[in-house]
A protein has these predicted regions:
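Ribonuclease/tRNase effector modules and their secretory precursors
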Residues: 1-91
Length: 91
């Protein structure tokens, strides 16, 4: 099933400036069949964190919220840290 994915343009610019990762490129992580996803309980809203591969083969960490079962708003994306890469590769 195709997800509807959105992000705020200003937030996407800040994310690229800070992490050098485009939110538009990070969408592919959500379609990675072996991605690792956990709930992030550190926030008021229910957030999810997924470690997976983007379209260029780079391992990314993507944070997002569900607006409904098929509608996602991306919050941030960054390159995986070494320990996150090991976690992903061991999955």
């Amino acid at each position: 099933m195709k997800l509807r994915i959105q992000f705020n343009a200003a937030k996407a610019t800040r994310n690229f400036t800070k992490h050098r990762v485009r939110l538009a490129d990070a969408e592919a992580v959500l379609y990675d069949p072996i991605a690792l996803t956990v709930e992030d309980n550190d926030h008021d809203e229910q957030r999810w964190v997924t470690i997976g591969v983007d379209g260029s083969g780079q391992i990314l960490v993507v944070v997002y919220v569900y607006r409904d079962p098929n509608f996602i708003r991306l919050i941030s994306a960054r390159k995986a840290q070494p320990q996150e890469t090991i976690q992903y590769q061991g999955a």
